Regions:
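Conserved pre-motif I regulatory segment
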Residues: 235-268
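Walker A/P-loop
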Residues: 261-283
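Post-DEXD/H (motif II) to motif III coupling segment of the RecA-like Helicase ATP-binding lobe
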Residues: 387-396, 402-467
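Conserved SF1/SF2 helicase motif Ia
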Residues: 282-309, 319-323, 422-423
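Conserved Walker A/P-loop ATP-binding site and its immediately adjacent core
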Residues: 293-316, 331-334, 434-438, 510
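Conserved interdomain linker/interface between the two RecA-like ATPase lobes of SF2 helicase motors
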Residues: 449-513
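Accessory nucleic-acid engagement/destabilization modules that flank
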Residues: 2-233
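C-terminal helicase lobe and adjacent C-terminal extensions/tails of nucleic-acid helicase motors
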Residues: 125, 439, 491-494, 498-504, ...
Length: 709
């Protein structure tokens, strides 16, 4: 028996009501699409199918029954004169409306109308559902006392009565469960909203016309599978050496000794020690045990994310039991990768045409590598941040170079890491140069237990803190030298490159790198000299990066043995990029970033046989002589961009008298010395601190660079 609806009461002061079946929700190929009832039913059915497909997985725990109500009711605001006027006129069907003049929008769109309608329908007793319904287009609305159903563009009492009749009909025909939102933790509300947005988008992709039947389970499942939103099958019985083609070192063995779903790992280990493989090894074990549904690898720059992307695809080919499994590259310019990736014989790309080719949807892919800002947008007030939160739910989230972010980004990361645990994620943080205070904050601890070991693996197992013991690693001495001006070392650098050494010269700004490159090529045109920075056009930059990272990478031995070279770069080669140099020249930088640069020296022992006999593991730091004078530092404080003069001066103080660094043993004591002496640096003017504002130390993060270059 069809549900019998009571007659509507029209008010001549408001637009006349349309019949419910004529209230359109969508257009289709330039003509009318399905009505509001069909779309609402389809959205709820799509949500239920998603929940059924993901049942038994980590993400499946977050398809809350209460979200069925929001999926069914989210577009009830489209039953309003203002929305129907808009869609009918857009389809050139205004003559079918029972009014003649266009209706001005007052309420703020159909999402706000949905919130106003539900607020009245539930007698102001379900604020979370109302807020979620109003936010399904990515913007959260807070209702005010002036918001009510009597606004003319909402149609008054007659249209509200029709909307409430539709709500009752959907409740009965969908058999919506008796449940509320009060039992759902506040931090999980965003991922609940994200699941509704996903169901809405998928149901909107169905080609439903005005007379189409309701979609059945076969259509719903095919839509989800076509989008690629299904759990992946992980191969079992694969060892670490099967995946990475080498046996795990002691640090990696320690990481794999304790696999804790939902924990926070902070892995501090030397540059080039295999932290990436350790993190991926943990991720594999969690996915194999069905304690994680995917992973997102977040890095500070586009270049580093692109290099990890290649390694992640190699990892997936070994671990995922599917033909050609691939990750998605996710950063501000990844559209170019999507467009060019793996074209077929007709020049088309399957990846480019995938459902995930959208910055808002890309994180929904089970496996991704990208910049950290893509994950941080789950925390900030941007459109559809809830979908990003839901996309991360249940995954392993690996954040590399966790030390490298500024104070603002660091505070967002601290908040994100805390929420990720509530979203069923396991978080793995990687760094070679993390301060103890930063470790405490990121690990979500009030106090950090005393432990000065290096390497150090901290595990926060839902509040239970453990340090996983790691044997002391092999150490290497690095010769240090400070040069006041680049003119003092040009001849030496050119001579050493001429003798076959691979020289890496890192500057702090693009302008400095360009100038050094210009001068070196003028002095030694016969030498192969390269330049990498973030201002190259994307196609040129990609070509340069691929060439040099292959040449100076783990497998570049044959080519590098042919002749020496000089590569001039900015911080894009500072971290998470696998390049190996015989000699490093670096402009002075904060101590932790200098260590990252030193990590490019003699990175692979397998290349030692092709190094020139005279090569020495050496770093030359370019630092002006006047750094010893606080007054001059104060005057020149803006010349250290993008870094604070304070941290440059502290770095100079700890390195100026060092002739040798023992890596990695010296990393922690040197960093501690660099951040411990705030009162040790004052200008000659009382009450002023050199290069910094205020009377308290700067944040633990000292780099002012953006996260994405």
């Amino acid at each position: 028996m069809p549900l019998r609806l009571p007659p509507r009461v029209e008010n001549p002061d408001y637009p006349k009501c349309l019949a419910p079946e004529r209230c359109l929700a969508k257009s289709l190929f330039g003509g009318p699409g399905c009505n509001v009832y069909t779309h609402s039913y389809a959205a709820c059915a799509m949500f239920r199918m998603l929940r059924a497909i993901w049942q038994g997985t980590r993400k499946g725990e977050f398809f809350f029954p209460a979200a069925e109500w929001c999926a069914a009711f989210h577009d009830i605001g489209k039953i309003s004169p203002v929305f129907q006027d808009k869609i009918y006129r857009a389809l050139q069907l205004a003559q079918q409306l029972p009014w003649s003049s266009p209706i001005a929008e007052q309420s703020g769109g159909h999402a706000r109308c949905s919130a106003i309608t539900l607020d009245a329908y539930f007698d102001h007793k379900n604020p979370e559902l109302i807020r979620m319904a109003g936010a399904h287009h990515g913007i959260s609305y807070e209702l005010t006392t002036g918001d009510n159903v009597n606004q003319k563009d909402l149609g008054g009492a007659a249209w509200q009565k029709m909307r409430e009749e539709m709500l009752r009909r959907l409740t009965i025909e969908l058999d919506l469960p008796e449940c509320g939102l009060n039992s759902i933790p506040k931090e999980q509300i965003p991922i609940m909203l994200g699941s509704v947005i996903l169901a809405d988008w998928l149901s909107s992709s169905l080609d439903l016309g005005p007379d189409s039947p309701l979609p059945d389970e076969t259509i719903l499942r095919e839509t989800i599978e076509k989008a690629g939103l299904i759990p992946h099958q992980v191969r079992s019985g694969i060892s670490f050496s099967d995946i990475f083609n080498f046996e795990p070192n002691p640090m990696q063995q320690a990481c794999l000794s304790q696999i804790v779903p939902g924990g926070i790992y902070v892995i501090e280990s030397g540059m080039g020690s295999g932290k990436t493989e350790a993190a991926l090894g943990i991720a594999y074990e969690l996915m194999r045990r069905k304690q994680a549904d995917g992973l997102y690898f977040a890095l500070p720059t586009q270049l580093t994310s692109e290099k990890i992307y290649d390694r992640l695809n190699d990892f997936l080919r070994k671990t995922i039991d599917e033909p050609d499994p691939r990750a998605i590259l996710i950063h501000g310019d990844s559209w170019l990768e999507w467009t060019l990736a793996n074209p077929d014989e007709n020049g088309n790309s399957d990846l480019a045409g995938s459902w995930f080719q959208s910055k808002k949807r890309a994180l929904m892919a089970s496996f991704g590598a990208g910049t950290v800002d893509q994950a941080l947008m789950a925390e900030v007030r941007v459109r559809h941040n809830a979908l990003r939160a839901f996309a991360l739910a249940g995954k392993v989230v690996i954040i590399d170079e966790i030390h490298s972010y500024d104070a603002y980004t660091g505070s967002l990361l601290t908040k994100l890491i805390g929420d990720l645990r509530s979203w069923g994620c396991t978080v793995i943080l990687l760094s070679a140069t993390l301060t103890s205070e930063a470790c405490r904050q990121f690990a979500q601890l009030n106090d950090l237990p005393d432990n000065s070991d290096y390497p150090r693996i901290l595990l926060n197992d839902h509040g239970k803190i453990a340090f996983i013991p790691v044997p002391a690693p092999e150490t290497h001495p690095v010769d240090l030298r400070i040069a006041g001006k680049e003119e003092d070392i040009f001849a030496e650098v050119i001579a050493r490159a001429g003798n076959g050494e691979q020289v890496l010269w890192i500057e702090n700004t693009v302008h400095q790198a360009q100038e050094i490159f210009r001068r070196l090529t003028a002095l030694a045109p016969e030498l192969e000299t390269g330049l990498i920075h973030s201002r190259f056009p994307a196609c040129i930059r990609r070509k340069q990066e691929d060439y040099w990272t292959e040449l100076l990478g783990r497998n570049g031995g044959a080519k590098r043995a042919q002749n020496g070279r000089i590569l001039v770069a900015t911080q894009v080669l500072e971290q998470s990029v696998d390049v190996d140099a015989d000699l490093l020249v670096s402009r002075i930088a904060p101590a932790d970033f200098l260590f990252q640069r030193i990590g490019r020296l003699w990175r692979h022992s397998g290349l030692n046989h092709v190094r020139p006999a005279a090569a020495a593991r050496q770093c030359i730091i370019l630092a002006p002589d006047w750094l010893s004078d606080p007054v001059q530092v104060e005057k020149q404080k803006f010349s250290f961009s993008p870094y604070s003069a304070y941290w440059i001066r502290r770095s100079w103080e700890v390195f100026q008298n060092k002739k040798t660094l023992i890596v990695p043993s010296d990393i922690r004591p040197v960093l501690s010395a660099a951040v411990s002496a705030w009162n040790g640096l004052t200008s000659t003017r009382p009450g002023r601190t050199t290069g910094c504002r205020g009377n308290s130390p700067p944040s633990q993060s000292r780099n002012d660079r953006r996260a994405v270059k």
